Amino acid sequence: MKAWTEVDIPGQRGRTAVVTGANSGIGFETARALALRGATVVLACRDLAKAEAAAIRIHRVAPQATLDVVPLDLASLASVRAAAGEIRARHDRIDLLVNNAGVTGLSGRTEDGFEIQFGVNHLGHFALTGLVLDLLLTAPGSRVVTVSSIGHQFGRIDTDDPDAGAGAYARSKLANLLFTYELQRRLQTAGASTTALAAHPGGAATEVFRYSSPWFRVPNLLIARLFGRTPAMGALPTLRAATDPEAAGGDYYGPGGLFEIRGYPERVRAAARAHDRDLGRRLWQVSQRLTAVTYPV
């Protein structure tokens, strides 16, 4: 089987993509690759200066790219609402939403009182997706791609207290998959052409570990470098989920090599609990209550 690479990304001219956390790492590489194929790319980032610097870097390799920068702090529901409002004011459709931004190793709470990894990685993206979903529904064949992690298999979620206990990062990444599968079921039931997919980068050397303790950060970066997982390689599963004409709603992409740490993107299988429909439904209900965001599907 031929390895899927950036060369396989179809033309994206006329399409609008929103990428969260697009200023660095996998998010930057995702935005760059989409811009090179002609997409209008919205870089939705917490640090506006870094986002603008990323846009300059993309313009160096894609001078004709149409780029937009929107401030987005996923640790603040007020910021999420403001970002959604800015996106809606500037764009009348979204063909692709990539929920990429993430944190790990941070302690503390979001502005709204949620455990920060669960709040940023899951609840912030849940809110953003709901607030712009009608723009996706307007675009035939649009996609929502949410970036999870191989670490989701260690996650456990108690929907009575979803952000409590140890293993916050794994829990948030499990939530990403539960959200994806529940969103896909709802879209399918509604007869929408919009689809929900997920991806994970394998072991890629990115800034997601920058807040982690050394005992966690250093081994992860060593593994990434040992197996040659640059951010550009780490972005390939996301890009395949986002653009491959053969990708279908509910598909999950990751590296096809040993332990899904390295290799080119292929369809992979999430842990059984990520497919728990009852858990997905209950997490959805809790997420709606915590964010005060309801969905049109």
Where in this protein do the model-derived segments appear?
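Pocket-edge positions in alpha/beta enzyme catalytic cores
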Residues: L43, L72, L226, A272-H275
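C-terminal helical subdomain
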Residues: L221-V268, R277-R281
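C-terminal amphipathic/interface module of NAD(P)-dependent oxidoreductases
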Residues: A271-V297
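Soluble or luminal CAZymes and related metallo-dependent hydrolases
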Residues: S79, G124, A175, T230-M233, ...
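Rossmann-fold NAD(P)H-dependent dehydrogenase/reductase core
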Residues: M1-S212, R289-V297
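Generic recognition of well-ordered alpha-helical segments
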Residues: E182, P237-R240, V286
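Short glycine/proline- and charge-enriched loop/turn segments
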Residues: T159-A164, P214-L222, R262-A271
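Short linear elements at protein peripheries
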Residues: G151-Q153, Y252, A274, W284-Q285
